Design a protein with these regions (language model features):
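Helix-biased detector of long, well-ordered alpha-helical tracts
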Residues: 1-332
Length: 332
């Protein structure tokens, strides 16, 4: 669904009032957080989607990494997961589902969590993901509502998975470009969480289907600030620039930009390729971390030690202005 449609539906839901519900549905948070005791809070999330790649094992890896990401974005540690499956068993052999589940289990195992069960329904197309429960210490919780003026913004993974997977579905994506995107999408965001901890960060969000620009705007609105992104500083996956020029955009790219129009202003030069990529729907994208400038080097060093070479400072947090988001383009 589009961000606009989801926002409308959630707006009509009843509010829940419980002092132990630390983070709920408000503010477009990445996951829910519930206090079991003063020392132990649980983090809960669920995510699933249709295949983006042909290999069922790799699809399972990507879907699991994407589901686990929300727990990492909150500063948490995944502990248990439940498989969520839609599968056309009257059309495809069960070996396909076995490979999907095997790929998901491999990523869950890498995360140090366990799969405790799941639920499967017959569907007209494949869908797979996880419901994940994690834990977080109160002093390590990160949310999208804690960005502060003066913070710098670090993006931990390059952008462009929407363009790559769209081109791949049409058999128009070079093998090396798809391989680079798969490597990024299957990488667990524990790397970003650990880097955020190294920088004592308290604000983060993961970049997924609504794209960098919308997720940044959501962080700005939740935090009561304005976020400024420098478009020309955005890191891109290998080969994405050519795919943008060839027009392999997702439908979500257009709807993401339409939703953001009233929340943002654009400064600087003419539209650039990187400006469009700011709205590209990501799958298992990186974390956007807001951190004090004095700790930015510690965060980047942690990321690069973990081979997240594309990690970059992409913007900053400003006092609240008329617009939640400012996109700055280089003036030639």
């Amino acid at each position: 669904m589009s961000v606009e449609g989801i926002t409308q539906v959630v707006r009509d839901l009843p509010a829940f009032h419980d002092l132990n519900l630390i983070v709920g549905a408000e503010g477009a948070s990445d996951a829910g957080v519930y206090r079991l005791s003063d020392e132990l809070w649980i983090v809960q999330t669920v995510d699933f989607f249709p295949p983006l790649v042909d290999d069922p094992f790799v699809y399972g890896q990507i879907a699991a990494a994407n589901s686990l990401s929300d727990v990492y974005a909150m500063g948490g540690t995944p502990k248990t997961a439940l498989n969520v499956v839609g599968f056309p068993d009257d059309q495809l052999p069960l070996e396909v589902l076995s490979e999907i589940l095997r790929g998901g289990a491999e990523r869950v195992q890498q995360a140090g969590a366990v799969i405790a069960g799941g639920h499967t329904v017959r569907d007209v197309e494949i869908k797979y993901g996880l419901s994940v429960t994690g834990i977080v210490a109160p002093d390590e919780l990160m949310t999208n509502r804690n960005a502060r003026p003066g913070d710098v913004l670090i993006l931990t993974k390059p952008l462009g998975t929407g363009y790559v997977t769209t081109a791949a579905k049409k058999d128009r994506c070079p093998d090396n470009v798809l391989a680079a995107a798969i490597q990024s999408m299957t990488q667990l965001n524990v790397v970003g969480r650990d880097a955020a901890r190294a920088g004592n960060a308290r604000a983060a969000t993961d970049i997924t289907g609504f794209g960098l620009a919308v997720h940044a705007a959501e962080m700005a609105l939740a935090s009561g600030v304005t976020i400024q992104l420098h478009v020309d500083h955005l890191p891109l996956l290998t080969g994405v620039e050519a795919l943008v020029e060839q027009g392999f955009r997702t439908r979500a790219t257009k709807s993401n930009r339409q939703f953001a129009e009233s929340l943002m202003k654009i400064e600087g030069g003419p539209d650039t390729m990187r400006l469009e990529v700011a709205f590209d729907a990501q799958t298992s994208g990186g974390l956007l971390i807001a951190v004090d400038p004095s700790m930015a080097d510690a965060v980047l060093q942690s990321l690069r030690t973990a081979e997240a070479a594309a990690a970059s400072i992409v913007g900053s947090v400003l006092p609240k202005q008329e617009h939640a988001l400012i996109l700055v383009r280089h003036v030639v």
